[in-house]
């Protein structure tokens, strides 16, 4: 089908190009923009109305004028050349190699705007993914096919946590093909260098595909990048039978780009200036995670977002929480105490944890042990608040044990090194070690036979 070319550019507003008298432009259709000096840019149709096509430009609008600019409509939506050879490679936000390697010889070209997985086609997630981080594996377990976001704040170590998870994550069955698709949106050059160096130096890059969009890159790339990353994941998972962990950071930058484009289109804003359709837009990303009936592959998602002002009620974390299956919250208070990774286990939640733990998956005592650790840590934190008012001298001997437990739980269980990879057996064993400082008669949430089998209390 021949490309249709138009020279009827009527207006340029921010990253948008308005082309008049285009009768058959289609939503998401790709376009080629040729400047008067022969330079070319790419774009995508965002909207069509009464012959007017609104085109989002990939790149700067510098040099583009209403006179002498030719817009060619390709008659197809954005497609990604895709192959297993993408593993071990680094790409920009529109899928072009930026690591100095050769172009990808595509075995397929897949549309990047794939639909969410049909609920009827979904298989219930049930297999444990080990991250090597106790606060996640032991208390907020990640399950294959789940979408579990990380809520962080400015200056908190979410980048280090993302790199650590990408390096350490694995399924317990070593025969399974496991890989990571990593997508970063709106990051600084320093952060991009950090991620690429970490992936290369630790060997994680060999089983990873990286997509990087810098803060200086066009905002439209931030809209496209997660879709390109997920298209790559879908190919590897559902056509090659691999188990893919998709890490997307920072979804707040993605939503800021969505707001910028919405403002350029002069749409009526919703909460805090974000477009009213942001919930629907986010769902088209998050709902592409999961498992398909009759297919060996799976896609697990860990979107990372920074909460402006540490406000968990901000529209981005708020809407993300509605769509996803829990959240991992990084605490600024724990970070101030140098308790990396600083995960607040009481605010965190994995809604699919019960499907991925227990006998035959992790260990039979996992659920009861996690509940007991939650209860003991919550009691210890309550006693901290009380101690600030009445002093530690007013506490009973038993209360002091719980107060001490909260401190040791943070310093030994939550805190761990950046290169410390704890197995699930190590994590569960550490939990029993910490509980041994409390009276055994207080262990109401673990079964007596589990106490007998795994408990670390000294026998009198």
Swiss-Prot record:
InterPro entries to which the protein is assigned, alphabetical: ATP-synt_VA_C, ATPase_F1/V1/A1_a/bsu_N, ATPase_F1/V1/A1_a/bsu_nucl-bd, P-loop_NTPase, V-ATPase_su_B/beta
GO molecular function, one term: proton-transporting ATP synthase activity, rotational mechanism
Pfam families, per the entry: ATP-synt_ab, ATP-synt_ab_N, ATP-synt_VA_C
SUPFAM superfamilies: C-terminal domain of alpha and beta subunits of F1 ATP synthase, P-loop containing nucleoside triphosphate hydrolases
One GO biological process term: proton motive force-driven plasma membrane ATP synthesis
Membrane topology of the entry: Peripheral membrane protein
UniProtKB keywords: ATP synthesis, Cell membrane, Hydrogen ion transport, Ion transport, Membrane, Transport
A Gene Ontology term for the protein's cellular component: plasma membrane
Locations listed in the record: Cell membrane
Keyword Ion transport: yes
Superkingdom of this protein's organism: Archaea
Location (main, coarse): membrane
NCBIfam families recorded: PRK04196.1
Function: Component of the A-type ATP synthase that produces ATP from ADP in the presence of a proton gradient across the membrane. The B chain is a regulatory subunit.
Subunit structure: Has multiple subunits with at least A(3), B(3), C, D, E, F, H, I and proteolipid K(x).
Family, as annotated: Belongs to the ATPase alpha/beta chains family.
Protein name as catalogued: A-type ATP synthase subunit B
Species per Swiss-Prot/TrEMBL record: Thermoplasma acidophilum (strain ATCC 25905 / DSM 1728 / JCM 9062 / NBRC 15155 / AMRC-C165)
């Amino acid at each position: 089908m021949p490309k249709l070319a138009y020279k009827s550019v009527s207006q340029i507003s921010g990253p948008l190009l308005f082309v008049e008298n285009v009768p058959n432009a289609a939503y998401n259709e790709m376009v080629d923009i040729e400047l008067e000096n022969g330079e070319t840019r790419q774009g995508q149709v965002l909207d069509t109305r009464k012959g007017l096509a609104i085109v989002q430009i990939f790149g700067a609008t510098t040099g583009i004028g209403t006179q002498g600019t030719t817009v060619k409509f390709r008659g197809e939506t954005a497609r990604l050349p895709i192959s297993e050879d993408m593993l071990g490679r680094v790409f920009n936000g529109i899928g072009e190699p930026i690591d100095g390697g050769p172009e990808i010889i595509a075995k397929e070209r897949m549309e990047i705007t794939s639909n969410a997985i049909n609920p009827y086609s979904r298989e219930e997630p049930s297999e444990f993914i080990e991250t090597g981080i106790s606060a996640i594996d032991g208390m907020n377990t990640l399950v294959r096919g789940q979408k579990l976001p990380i809520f962080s704040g400015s200056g908190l170590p979410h980048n280090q946590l993302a790199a650590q998870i990408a390096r350490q994550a694995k399924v317990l069955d070593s025969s399974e093909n496991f890989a990571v698709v990593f997508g970063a949106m709106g990051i600084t050059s320093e952060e991009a260098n950090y991620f690429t160096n970490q992936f290369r130096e630790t060997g994680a890059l060999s089983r990873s595909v990286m997509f990087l969009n810098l803060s200086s890159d066009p905002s439209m790339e931030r809209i496209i990048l997660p879709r390109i990353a997920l298209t790559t994941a879908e190919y590897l998972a559902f056509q090659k039978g691999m188990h893919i962990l998709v890490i997307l950071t920072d979804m707040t930058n993605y939503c800021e780009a969505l707001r910028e484009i919405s403002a350029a289109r002069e749409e009526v804003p919703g909460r805090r200036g974000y477009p009213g359709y942001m919930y629907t837009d986010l769902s088209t990303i998050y709902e592409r995670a999961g498992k398909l009936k009759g297919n060996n592959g799976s896609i697990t998602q860990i979107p990372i977002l920074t909460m402006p002002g540490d406000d968990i009620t901000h529209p981005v974390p708020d809407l993300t929480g509605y769509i996803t299956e829990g959240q991992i919250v990084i605490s600024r208070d724990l970070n101030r105490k140098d308790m990396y990774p600083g995960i607040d286990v009481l605010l965190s939640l994995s809604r699919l944890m019960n499907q991925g733990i227990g006998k035959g998956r992790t260990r039979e005592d996992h659920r009861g042990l996690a509940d007991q650790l939650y209860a003991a840590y919550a009691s210890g934190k309550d006693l901290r608040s009380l101690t600030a008012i009445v002093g530690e001298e007013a506490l009973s001997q038993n209360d002091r044990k719980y107060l001490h437990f909260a401190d040791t739980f943070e310093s030994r269980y939550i805190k761990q090194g950046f290169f410390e990879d704890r197995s699930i057996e190590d994590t569960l064993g550490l939990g029993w070690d910490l509980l041994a400082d409390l009276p055994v008669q207080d262990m109401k949430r673990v079964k007596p036979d589990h106490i007998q089998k795994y408990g670390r209390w000294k026998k009198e």
